[in-house]
Amino acid sequence: MKRTFSILLALLLLLLPLACSDAQPETVTLQRHEVTRSVFYAPQYIALGLGFFAEEGLNVEITTSGGSEKAMTALLSGEADLCLAGPETGVYVMNEGKADHPVIVGQLTKRDGSFLIARTPAERFSWNDLLGKTVIGGRAGGMPIMTLRWVMAQNGLVDGENCTIIDSIQFNLMAGAFEGGEGDYVTLFEPTATEFQKAGKGYIVANIGLESGEVPYTCYFASQKMISEHPERIEAFLRAIYRAQQWIETASDEDAAKAMQPYFPDASLDSLMAVVKSYRETDSWMKDPIMRESAYERLLSVIDFNGELSGRPAFAELVNNTFAEKAAGE
């Protein structure tokens, strides 16, 4: 009897680790680079804060690169598994003729997320206020400056003719340059724009996203190697993003702000709530991570308008919606 009990106990001890491994799958670490740290990308911080990535067996480590080019470089070098960047970066890489070009696997935002900041408050802002003025627009060829040029042109403002747009300052240095005295206006993302206004360093006078209309603005890229070797990780990542996109649709501004607050230690809860409210009202976030071809064509039109388009890559060559569609249950 004792011998039988000992054998059963030994078998139980052998099987116990297997049972535990089924209940707790091995966590995979994903290195993901982003352009900047902004509430504009709220769904991904919510996915982190609410444990959506963890529930998919993912440990997502985020590095802030300071611009789309740097984020894309990290992906191309293998330093990043995924990167969040402007889709124009992928267009440029394809037009360089790179065979192993990165692929867009999901879309996060659907319009420009920046705000026009002036040095003094404007009770009734008019785009004519920019006549003869200088605007810090960001890096030439980047989405922030291209949508800015698009909007300004629609309002009769042409760089070099009746205004000046500075296109030589890196994205992550724009706020510092403006604070240091350069330019009459600058475009900034949240929460920097609101924090700037609270500190009296500048004043929000216009919402670029409302003026520009819908356009794919920030997307998730994966390398072809990642797609080939670890498709399940991409799908798991996008499932978490989709859950966050759906969650923020019905969450209160306060709940959304609290969920992402750990990733914005320098911003107050009130500021985060105000920013969430602003981006929600402007319909900035995608409701699912699937990019639409019509939106992609609009993107190419914006790039072409800015004189930065040397070729029009086919939608199916740059975008792979397979993972996003599975994540969203389509």
Residue ranges and their predicted role:
Residues 41, 72, 76, 87-90, ...:
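Extracytoplasmic/secreted envelope proteins and their assembly/folding machinery
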Residues 2-10:
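Sec-dependent signal peptide recognition
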Residues 228-309:
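Secondary-structure end/capping motifs
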Residues 21-23:
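Bacterial signal peptide processing site
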Residues 26-170, 184-190, 201, 206-207, ...:
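Short, glycine-/small- and polar/acidic-enriched structural segments
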